């Protein structure tokens, strides 16, 4: 190897330079190539869905943050390096044996600019990239407005705390990072060039090093003073008193807040003492100031509040925390919209006073009682409506309502989607998987309040064709025949929850002009996609990009891809909304509806904040389990609004965002940040609005908060005596809370069907029923919450107690033993329904599923029995239990003959139910069990009792029940004042 003359750097041969250059290029391509591909694909996709302005705004915001933070950090660090380098000692002994940094110093001296600029720029870019994730804070600060509500402590508008304060904190944090990095860079540079020597016995520091380090240390302390000042405002979101309440308490206001001001003053004095090192050589002054700051932070900022909390607040907490609990109550009600303007409270006895058949509201409620459980029937839908092995329904079906022939009816609904996971054999070939099996077929609904027929023979239930949904199918076949209960003009489904489970998730549609259709449509027809959705891959550049993205060379060589081909990506409705509106939080349960003849997914979207002063924290997301098994709570928020309703067209993927809360200042802020992306509420079609449901995620948050925040008096709030709890799910062994349920019930004023989301509530650490919460979904009253409050000493049983009472009933227990010989038992949703002018009716469907004896055989649930229960009048918590193949028979068992006539009978078609009493032969009406707190015994029966005698006894008992009813009414009249 040739070497140059002394003093010249060695030169690499030309071939070596080419290899190094090629290697660096390959490394850069590997590092940045996939990211550049993703950026270009996003550019194409956002343009296809019409939201490219969102992508550009977010990108420019993040680039601006990167540039600003990188410039500040790199500038400060570079200035520190430059000052330290220029003020280095003129002579530093270059003796490696005595100076361990001498080789490094020599290397730096050969290329000082490269090292200086390289370190500064690298640190700046890294900090800028990390800071770019704060783009949401920047946009909220730039476009934020006011709430029109001021905080109770400082008198500032809430907008300051949620829009401005997070931005100020972020700016302060990055300034702090920049100054600390500059201090460290100065320290290392002075050490490298001899301004700081540690090799001598006591060390040495040059004047230039002392001044520079002191200035940067003073800047750090000065920034800490600003941090103490901002800490004062963040006390209003303090978690010191959690779980009792959120926000500043007595200790925060009377100890922490003054302590922050004291620490601000001390930090400023400490910073000034560091700056005096510019003129004074004695470093003991800043050292003592720093010690004073640390000691003050411990004593004033830590020990003083701790002592006040321990010896002054806790012994008198109920009194001293009272005004701060009141602040928390008011803020939480406002932040979650659970205040008096949105929640109506009504006293409710919990014991029925009338026969349901005599109450118009109850007649409607009973006729609409939902017997089909969307959590159980997905496999039934799949087995009976699948058509092909590659079609499937969502694991949990949905509930919605439709007006058919003028009658409002709730339906269990699902979309027959393509299931990529169900493809087998040659169906999984790349061509078939991505170009042939591309879409689902149809919308399937079933009336939620009835089945095709009652299943009566317990021993042969699994062999009967009873207890199954009555389907209304809107697909390609029914479109051709013209027989559709719910008219759908375009039943093909290219976007959905199930179809998006493909890995990777994409379909290739279209082809060369004039080419034959290849997408599977039916057994006798194929189809070519004509929708607007999809990114064009008709040119070779885009094909190459997608071949790179999906690591699939067949994009380049397949003859199935032509000039008109497009690729459909991001097919999950929820994901599409999240991508076009990254500032929204989406509900976990999109649901399909039919609007104007098209299948559309509705996605509820929320605006959220996490710094609303004094508001209780909660989470819209359930616990998340990491791959390592660690369970983490979802994102904590302190403000939620269901401000946007989003729709995704199931055929072409069109995403539309509709404003749904004109009063939400957070949504108004985002609409200013992304103009034109959210349509005004006036543009919501009436047919679409009729299908809006109150979202489950929001309701679950609100009911958990109402369990505490229905209490008005702070002292009572502190004692927790009046709190409620969300009941555990009696049908689930995993200790989960009972999910809310959608029901169609009679409206209290008009007795017309009203679609609501409801939940029972039990007492705090008790199982007795305490309240019943329902949220209206009808357009006229959407969002209104109704709370029925039971007396605090109520003995009305809650869901878990009722479940125990029902399954321990001797009739249920004995037949369950018979059923379990060849079936698995599934208990459906336990519905709680206000009824009988003060009472609560519990209804629970019981499903059976035949135990499979062959791996190839398929089994699925069917409705076999209906359990009902009500509280016995005039007893200490006794209940009546009804158990029969139909709801009508079960109701007659608990209310007496006649009530069951208003229930919807099995049979009919999906559009209309059979007339009352047309549900087939039913056994004679049973008499309510005796009034007792114990489960009723099964009626005696045996082969030695003649049938005529049985009929005579039943008739006599029915007459006796009528006499008892008249006697109860007479007693009520006698006890009524003035009666």
Swiss-Prot record:
Q: How does it sit in the membrane?
A: Multi-pass membrane protein
Which parts of the chain span the membrane according to its record? 19-39, 63-83, 114-134, 174-194, 211-231, 260-280, 288-308
Arranged from A to Z, the UniProt key words for this protein are: Cell membrane, Membrane, Transmembrane, Transmembrane helix
Compositional bias of kind Pro residues: 913-946
Where is it chiefly localized?
Answer: membrane
Sorted alphabetically, which InterPro entries does this protein's record hold? UPF0182 (IPR005372)
Tell me the Pfam families matching this sequence. Answer: UPF0182 (PF03699)
List, as start-end ranges, the regions of compositional bias called Low complexity.
Answer: 902-912
Report the locations given in the UniProt record.
Cell membrane
Q: One GO cellular component from the entry?
A: extracellular region
Q: Where is this region: Disordered?
A: 898-948
Family, according to the entry, reads as follows:
Belongs to the UPF0182 family.
* PANTHER family in the record: UPF0182 PROTEIN SLL1060
Protein name as annotated: UPF0182 protein BCG_0095
- Per the UniProt record, the source organism is Mycobacterium bovis (strain BCG / Pasteur 1173P2)
């Amino acid at each position: 190897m040739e070497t140059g003359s002394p003093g010249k750097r060695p030169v690499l041969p030309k071939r070596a330079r080419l290899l190094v250059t090629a290697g660096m290029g390959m490394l850069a391509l590997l590092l940045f190539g996939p990211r550049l591909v993703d950026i270009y694909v996003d550019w194409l996709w956002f343009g296809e869905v019409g939201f490219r302005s969102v992508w550009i705004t977010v990108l420019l915001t993040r680039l601006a943050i990167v540039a600003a933070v990188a410039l500040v950090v790199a500038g400060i660090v570079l200035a520190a390096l430059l000052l330290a380098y220029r003020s280095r000692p003129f002579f530093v002994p270059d003796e490696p044996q005595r100076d361990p940094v001498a080789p490094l110093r020599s290397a730096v001296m050969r290329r000082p600019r490269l090292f200086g600029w390289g370190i500064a720029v690298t640190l700046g870019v890294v900090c800028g990239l990390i800071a770019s994730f704060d783009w949401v804070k920047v946009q909220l600060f730039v476009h934020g407005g006011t709430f029109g509500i001021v905080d109770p402590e400082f008198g500032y508008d809430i907008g300051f705390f949620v829009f401005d304060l997070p931005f100020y904190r972020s700016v302060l944090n990055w300034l702090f990072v920049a100054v600390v990095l500059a201090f460290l860079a100065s320290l290392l540079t002075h050490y490298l060039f001899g301004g700081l020597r540690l090799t001598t016995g006591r060390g040495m520091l040059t004047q230039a090093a002392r001044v520079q380090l002191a200035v940067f240390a003073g800047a750090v302390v000065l920034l800490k003073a600003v941090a103490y000042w901002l800490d004062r405002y963040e006390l209003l979101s303090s978690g010191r008193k959690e779980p009792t309440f959120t926000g500043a308490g007595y200790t925060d206001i009377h100890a922490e807040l003054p302590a922050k001001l004291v620490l601000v003053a001390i930090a400023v004095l400490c910073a000034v003492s560091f700056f005096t090192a510019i003129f004074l050589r004695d470093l003991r002054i800043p050292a003592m100031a720093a010690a004073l700051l640390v000691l003050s932070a411990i004593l004033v900022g830590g020990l003083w509040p701790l002592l006040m909390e321990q010896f002054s607040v806790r012994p008198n907490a109920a009194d001293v925390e009272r005004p701060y609990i009141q602040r928390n109550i008011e803020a939480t009600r406002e932040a979650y919209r659970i205040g008096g303007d949105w929640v109506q409270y009504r006293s409710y006895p919990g014991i029925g006073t009338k026969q349901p058949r005599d109450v118009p509201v109850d007649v409607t409620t009973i006729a609409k009682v939902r017997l089909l459980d969307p959590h159980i029937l997905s496999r039934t839908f799949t087995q009976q409506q699948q058509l092909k092995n590659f079609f499937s329904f969502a694991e949990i079906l949905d509930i919605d309502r439709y007006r058919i022939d003028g009658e409002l009816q709730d339906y269990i609904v699902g979309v027959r989607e393509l299931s990529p996971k169900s493809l087998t054999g040659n169906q999984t070939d790349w061509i078939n998987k991505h170009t042939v099996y591309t879409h689902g077929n149809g919308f399937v609904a079933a009336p939620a309040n009835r089945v095709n027929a009652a299943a009566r023979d317990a021993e042969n239930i699994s062999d009967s064709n009873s207890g199954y949904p009555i389907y209304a199918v809107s697909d390609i076949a029914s479109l051709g025949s013209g027989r559709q209960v719910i008219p759908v003009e375009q039943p093909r489904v290219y976007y959905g929850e199930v179809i998006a489970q493909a890995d990777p998730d994409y379909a290739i549609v279209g082809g060369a002009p004039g080419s034959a259709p290849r997408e599977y449509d039916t057994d006798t027809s194929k189809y070519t996609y004509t929708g607007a959705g999809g990114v064009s891959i008709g040119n070779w550049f885009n094909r190459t990009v997608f071949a790179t993205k999906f690591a699939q060379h067949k994009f380049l060589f397949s003859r199935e891809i032509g000039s008109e081909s497009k690729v459909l990506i991001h097919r999950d409705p929820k994901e599409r909304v999240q991508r076009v509106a990254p500032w929204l939080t989406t509900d976990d349960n999109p649901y399909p509806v039919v609007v104007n003849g098209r299948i559309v997914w509705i996605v509820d979207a929320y605006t959220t904040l996490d710094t609303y002063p004094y508001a209780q924290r909660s989470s819209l997301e359930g616990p998340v389990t990491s791959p390592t098994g660690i369970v983490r709570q979802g994102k904590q928020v302190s403000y939620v609004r269901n401000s946007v309703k989003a729709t995704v067209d199931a055929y072409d993927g069109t995403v539309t965002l509709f404003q749904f809360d004109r009063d939400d200042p957070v949504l108004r802020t985002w609409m200013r940040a992304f103009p034109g992306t959210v349509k005004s509420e006036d543009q919501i079609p009436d047919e679409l609005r009729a299908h809006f449901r109150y979202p489950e995620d929001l309701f679950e948050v609100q009911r958990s908060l109402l369990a505490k925040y229905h209490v008005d008096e702070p002292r009572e709030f502190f004692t927790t005596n009046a709190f409620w709890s969300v009941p555990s799910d009696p049908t689930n062994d995993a200790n989960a809370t009972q999910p809310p349920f959608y029901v169609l019930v009679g409206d209290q004023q008009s007795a017309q069907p009203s679609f609501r989301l409801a939940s029972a509530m039990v007492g705090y650490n008790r199982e007795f029923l305490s309240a019943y919460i329902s949220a209206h979904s009808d357009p006229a009253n959407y969002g209104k919450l109704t709370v029925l409050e039971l007396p605090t000493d109520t003995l009305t049983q809650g869901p878990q107690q009722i479940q125990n009472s029902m399954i321990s009933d001797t009739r249920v227990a004995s037949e369950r033993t018979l059923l379990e010989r060849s079936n698995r038992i599934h208990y459906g949703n336990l519905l709680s329904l206000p009824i009988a002018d003060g009472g609560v009716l519990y209804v629970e469907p019981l499903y059976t599923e035949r135990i499979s004896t062959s791996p190839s055989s398929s089994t699925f649930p069917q409705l076999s029995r209906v359990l009902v229960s009500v509280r016995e009048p005039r007893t200490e918590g006794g209940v009546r239990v009804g158990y029969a193949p139909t709801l009508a028979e079960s109701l007659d068992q608990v209310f007496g003959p006649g009530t069951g006539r208003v229930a919807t009978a099995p049979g009919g078609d999906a559009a209309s139910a059979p007339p009352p009493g047309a549900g087939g032969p039913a056994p004679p009406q049973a008499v309510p069990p005796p009034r007792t707190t114990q489960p009723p015994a099964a009626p005696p029966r045996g082969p030695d009792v003649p049938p005529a005698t049985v009929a005579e006894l039943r008739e006599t008992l029915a007459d006796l029940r009528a006499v008892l009813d008249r006697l109860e009414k007479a007693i009520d009249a006698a006890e009524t004042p003035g009666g």
